[in-house]
């Protein structure tokens, strides 16, 4: 599936789950962002737990928020 134009994909690690399917994720470069689960992951009931490695898609307009698009097995 093609990624959105201008979106930045970066690997990270889930630090803590938050209410409403939000997660605090520490990126590979050390920054911490607030991320929610993408619709397809929610649709297929993919569970995300603390310490999971994930791929986060960031918007170039707001680098403090992102969308989790993949969870490594």
Swiss-Prot record:
GO cellular component, one term: cytosol
Entries under Pfam families matching the protein: eIF-1a (PF01176)
Domain of life the protein comes from: Bacteria
Name of the featured protein: Translation initiation factor IF-1
Protein's gene: infA
Residue ranges of domain S1-like in the record: 1-73
UniProt entry keywords in alphabetical sequence: Cytoplasm, Initiation factor, Protein biosynthesis, RNA-binding, rRNA-binding
InterPro entries assigned to the protein according to its UniProt record, in alphabetical order: NA-bd_OB-fold (IPR012340), RNA-binding_domain_S1_IF1 (IPR006196), TIF_IF1 (IPR004368)
Primary location group: cytoplasm
């Amino acid at each position: 599936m093609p990624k959105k134009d201008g979106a930045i994909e970066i690997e990270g690690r889930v630090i803590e789950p938050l209410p409403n399917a939000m997660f605090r994720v520490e990126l590979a470069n050390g920054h911490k962002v607030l991320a929610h689960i993408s619709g397809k992951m929610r649709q297929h009931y993919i569970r995300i737990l603390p310490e999971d490695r994930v791929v986060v898609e960031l918007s170039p307009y707001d680098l403090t928020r992102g969308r989790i698009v993949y969870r490594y097995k």
